[in-house]
Curated annotation (Swiss-Prot):
This is Prominin-1. It comes from Homo sapiens. Changing residue 264 to R: Loss of expression of the protein in part due to proteasomal degradation. One of its GO terms (molecular function) is actinin binding. Belongs to the prominin family.
């Protein structure tokens, strides 16, 4: 029933499902950012047996030994084909061959069944004749025991052998109890397992409409992204055009701007230089006049009579000789002015080159705004197309017959659930009968083995090696009786147990080998996929059932595998044959509509970097003459002292010499002149030095600017021509390329979205994984794990225990002779004939007819018995 139920679940979905088309791959492109919300199912994908799985594997190994051959796909196909025939001719060679193949495959199972049947037939017969034989005082029925030299050894061997066999039987009984309990507990889980599967199936039914709504909702996300780019066409398209033009234009404008800055710096440097030269001319004249005055004063002071007297005369002569150093630098007054160059630069600055450059920058930066102004109409048209695409997609999804599919499948699920819930109590009732029957069987075996254990226990504990067979104690005798009771029960019930073992073995082994194992390896599906097997008119049953196109390859194995991979129903069942979503979505048609609108997008840009006035301005600056100035002459003067000597040192030296003179007018006059020289240094020399420093800085600026000025301007003008030519010749192609790129971006959103719709409907929507899980639950879990595995473990354990009852009863019969109290025993009158064992035990032979009050009717020698 479980197998039929699982198959109906799968075929029910197949027979009532029609959906969209299948993409070329089951893997979504990495560029897609859409993802359907994950659906969580309650039923586990796999079933784990737990620790008892070790016992199940032990049974599987035994079955592999009994039936090691591979699954007979061809034989099963031919058998099913024969089964569908209205009349079977058993005399046909192919029928005979098929029968032989079946026998060959089932050889191991048949052999075990034959052995079991022999056991069933022979055990009652053997038991009957054994009983009759015992009643005739044969077969160990005579209560007399011969004394044997190896008797104690045999007793121990029989006891140990029986104990080992009883342990083996106990293990088998344990397997039986465990298997019986597993069936009981697992059947109780069936209701919860069924409810879990039906809950997952209803989750599938409920989630599918939500998935479709989610897919439709993602169009708004896509459209909003496209609208954002359309509303930002100034930054997206205009920015793209600007980024393409910027590398060829900005460097030129930056160079022109730096040149405009250089012109301003040149003007400032020339103005500073011109004013500095005028200041130097005036300051140098004043310095020369001051030095002339101080020299006149010093000469007048040196005319003092004291200078004629030794040693003052030497000091005066020294001072007189140094007066020639008090001169100014006349070359400072000869430096040429820069009025002409300054006038040229001022003429250049009459044209606002910096403003012209800013206009070039502005014309470039205005590209995004100009693009937005010129594309307003086109953007509105594209938005209308995008809105219409949304309506088309909504119409396509509404035409998908998913609601009809879900409604039909929902009815099927409800009917199946009602059927299962209606029959589960019956199943649980039958399970109770099975459990009670298994409990009785295991208890019966337990009773038998308990008698054996009690017999061993009483026999071993009550055995007295000094007692004769006729004088054995009550405990030992009870042990022997227990053993014989076990033997009697074994003969009475073991053949009945073997009947149960054979029947369950044949059923369980064949179901395991022909259903469970091939289901796991999918070989069973390959048999069902055999062309013309299930329907002689259809090559492939599923495609014929669904589409009436039996030539289309749609197999049970492929459908089951796809469902296990959580693939959507549409792609799993190749339902594009009834509703091709690719044709209805028609991605190229929708993207073509967007492309046609984008083709009408035209952008005109007139960019002029620098006019003729700006070019002439640069050329005039290059010809202003600052590159032809003799900067070395200016720099040479800036390195010289304004006076012929360091006036401060001269003043200190003069003051020292004056101090060496005797006090008087000459000394005072020289000190006053020294102070005057210090004042000249402070008021005349230091300002000149400051002016020379300013002149040096201005000269360096002009020298740096004028160095290679003509070449730089020529290079800038060449770059300007190149940039302007690039704008003239390439702007239109740049606009076209960026427009296409912009269009591909807009179209790409919808291509990805439409492809995602196709992929989702084909691979994700209405994932049939719950159906595969339900089939696994019905076959692999319920039938194989809940029923067949415990059933196989049951017959394996009970069969092992039953088989070992045979050697157990043999050893029990042998061993009972050593525990039971005998009616007679061997008597030895001659001590020389007493067995050595008896001598060792201190028994000198039996000389009386009555020993311990027990009549001894047989008084013969051992040879008579």
């Amino acid at each position: 029933m479980a197998l039929v139920l699982g198959s109906l679940l799968l075929l029910g979905l197949c027979g009532n499902s029609f959906s969209g088309g299948q993409p070329s791959s089951t893997d979504a492109p990495k560029a897609w950012n859409y993802e359907l919300p994950a659906t969580n199912y309650e039923t586990q994908d796999s079933h784990k047996a737990g620790p008892i799985g070790i016992l199940f594997e032990l049974v599987h190994i035994f079955l592999y030994v009994v039936q090691p051959r591979d699954f007979p796909e061809d034989t099963l196909r031919k058998f099913l084909q024969k089964a569908y025939e209205s009349k079977i001719d058993y005399d046909k060679p192919e029928t005979v061959i098929l029968g032989l193949k079946i026998v060959y495959y089932e050889a191991g199972i048949i052999l075990c069944c034959v052995l079991g049947l022999l056991f069933i037939i022979l055990m009652p017969l053997v038991g009957y004749f054994f009983c009759m034989c015992r009643c005739c005082n044969k077969c160990g029925g005579e209560m007399h025991q011969r004394q044997k030299e190896n008797g104690p050894f045999l007793r121990k061997c029989f006891a140990i052998s029986l104990l080992v066999i009883c342990i083996i039987i106990s293990i088998g009984i344990f397997y039986g109890f465990v298997a019986n309990h597993q069936v009981r507990t697992r059947i109780k889980r069936s209701r919860k397992l069924a409810d879990s599967n039906f809950k997952d199936l209803r989750t599938l039914l409920n989630e599918t409409p939500e998935q479709i709504k989610y897919i439709l909702a993602q169009y708004n996300t896509t459209k909003d992204k496209a609208f954002t780019d359309l509303n930002s066409i100034n930054s997206v398209l205009g920015g793209g055009i600007l980024d393409r033009l910027r590398p060829n234009i900005i460097p030129v404008l930056d160079e022109i701007k730096s040149m405009a800055t250089a012109i301003k710096e040149t003007k400032e440097a020339l103005e500073n230089m011109n004013s500095t030269l005028k200041s130097l001319h005036q300051q140098s004249t004043q310095l020369s006049s001051s030095l002339t005055s101080v020299k006149t004063s010093l000469r007048s002071s040196l005319n003092d009579p004291l200078c004629l007297v030794h040693p003052s005369s030497e000091t005066c002569n020294s001072i007189r000789l140094s007066l020639s150093q008090l001169n100014s630098n006349p070359e400072l007054r000869q430096l040429p002015p820069v009025d002409a160059e300054l006038d040229n630069v001022n003429n250049v600055l009459r044209t606002d080159l910096d403003g012209l450059v800013q206009q070039g920058y502005q014309s470039l930066n205005d590209i995004p705004d100009r693009v937005q102004r010129q594309t307003t109409t086109v953007v509105a048209g594209i938005k209308r197309v995008l809105n219409s695409i949304g309506s088309d997609i909504d119409n396509v999804t509404q035409r998908l017959p998913i609601q009809d599919i879900l409604s039909a499948f929902s009815v099927y699920v409800n009917n199946t659930e009602s059927y299962i819930h209606r029959n589960l109590p019956t199943l649980e009732e039958y399970d109770s009968y099975w459990w009670l029957g298994g409990l009785v069987i295991c208890s019966l075996l337990t009773l038998i083995v308990i008698f054996y254990y009690l017999g061993l226990l009483c026999g071993v504990c009550g055995y007295d090696r000094h007692a004769t067979p006729t004088t054995r104690g009550c405990v030992s005798n009870t042990g022997g009786v227990f053993l014989m009771v076990g033997v009697g029960l074994s003969f009475l019930f073991c053949w009945i147990l073997m009947i149960i073992v054979v029947l369950t073995f044949v059923f369980g082994a064949n179901v395991e080998k022909l259903i469970c194992e091939p289901y796991t390896s999918k070989e069973l599906f390959r048999v069902l996929d055999t062309p013309y097997l299930l329907n002689e008119d259809w090559e492939y049953y599923l495609s014929g059932k669904l589409f009436n196109k039996s030539k289309m390859k749609l197999t049970f194995e492929q459908v089951y595998s796809d469902c296990k991979k959580n693939r959507g129903t549409y792609g799993t069942l190749h339902l594009q044959n009834s509703f091709n979503i690719s044709e209805h979505l028609n991605i190229n048609e929708h993207t073509g509509s967007i492309s046609s609108e984008l083709e009408s997008l035209k952008v005109n840009l007139n960019i002029f970097l620098l006019g003729a006035a700006g070019r002439k301005n640069l050329q005039d600056f290059a010809a202003c003459g600052i590159d032809r100035m003799n900067y070395d002459s200016y720099l040479a003067q800036t390195g010289k002292s304004p006076a012929g000597v360091n006036l401060l040192s001269f003043a200190y030296d003069l003051e020292a010499k004056a101090n060496s003179l005797p006090p008087g007018n000459l000394r005072n006059s020289l000190k006053r002149d020294a102070q005057t020289i210090k004042t000249i240094h402070q008021q005349r020399v230091l300002p000149i030095e400051q002016s020379l420093s300013t002149l040096y800085q201005s000269v360096k600026i002009l020298q740096r600017t004028g160095n290679g000025l003509l070449e730089r301007v020529t290079r800038i003008l060449a770059s300007l021509d190149f940039a302007q030519n690039f704008i003239t010749n390439n702007t239109s192609s740049v606009i076209i390329e960026e427009t296409k790129k912009y269009g591909r971006t807009i179209i790409g959103y919808f291509e990805h979205y439409l492809q995602w719709i196709e992929f989702s409907i084909s691979e994700k929507v209405a994932s049939c994984k719950p159906v595969a899980t339900a089939l696994d639950t019905a076959v692999d879990v319920f039938l194989c794990s809940y029923i067949i595995d415990p059933l196989n473990l049951f017959w394996f354990g009970i069969g092992k225990a039953t088989v070992f009852l045979l050697p157990a009863l043999i050893f029990a019969v042998k061993l009972a002779k050593y525990y039971r109290r005998m009616d007679s025993e061997d008597v030895y009158d001659d001590v020389e004939t007493i067995p050595m064992k008896n001598m060792e035990n201190g028994n000198n032979g039996y000389h009386k007819d009555h020993v311990y009050g027990i009549h001894n009717p047989v008084m013969t020698s051992p040879s008579q018995h």
